[in-house]
């Protein structure tokens, strides 16, 4: 996430296609090398290379998509792009575990790397980098430095609230994903194989459907009122909260799975609309860097604090609640959706005015 910022800084100045190809190549090669690591240091260095390659693909991809589609049509393609996360998780849960069980973790790394190398070749011949600002009908200016982009975001009321709200949503999501396997094993005495199959269906398929539909409905409703891009996230987050609480407190595994289906499906819905509004509010010449800043904050706080918070709360609750400590900790984390909704609602309240200030039509 950290190295995504300098890579995005470069992507706003050179060919985004080349940045994506180089990053994907690095990701795939270093993933393959992970399978040959002989000690912890070698595996750590290879894994760092994987992270650098991963960090360099998303921001320029988001910026290119924003330049290909009109402002009121961006949420859908950005959501479709995000489906890679759900598909990857589905494959990891179903295929990765099987390969690891039968052939070992080294082979699993090598198998995972091969599709990326194939995509590098495909991208070299088919990927096109559109002119910056094409979909906005304006020519991009000279790319600004990092400080100017950071100040632009900080001084924009909508972007401030959007980043805070989306970060809280991500914190809830990362915490849940990290602890759901332990929750099902510890609370419902399920096997790891059973948990893998359930999460593959819930997150891989259910989450993927929710992500795609979120982008679609955000674009459809947003054509009536652009604020629906954010209202949609707020409404579904609030509707999904009781389902999450009920699932974590359920004493029956089947009931917990059924209740989780809805919040997991809409949990990643924020992705398309959030990125669509980000790229509508920033200038074309700063899109890659703005996207990298958003992802950096989302990941550092969401991934850094989300799972940790549940673990700390579970330890704290264990004295008084014993085996129910983890469910109560996950319920507490889920309540952050209320806080997130406040910031996203505030972002919606200033969205139209801030879009008009950019010279576009809200």
Language model: regions and residue ranges:
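Cytoplasmic helix-loop-helix junction between adjacent transmembrane helices
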Residues: 46-86
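C-terminal ends and interior cores of transmembrane alpha-helices
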Residues: 25-38, 237-251
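Helix-breaking motifs and short loop linkers at transmembrane-helix boundaries and internal kinks
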Residues: 15, 36-42, 53, 70, ...
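Juxtamembrane intracellular "pre-TM" segments in multi-pass secondary transporters
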Residues: 131-163, 187
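Symmetry-related core transmembrane helices of the 12-TM Major Facilitator Superfamily/SLC fold
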Residues: 107-125, 327-346
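Conserved MFS/SLC helix-loop-helix module at the cytosolic interface between two early adjacent transmembrane helices
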Residues: 2-41
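Helix-loop-helix hairpin linking two adjacent transmembrane segments in secondary transporters
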Residues: 81-129
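Extracytoplasmic gate region of multi-pass secondary transporters
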Residues: 157-212, 267-271, 275, 303-310
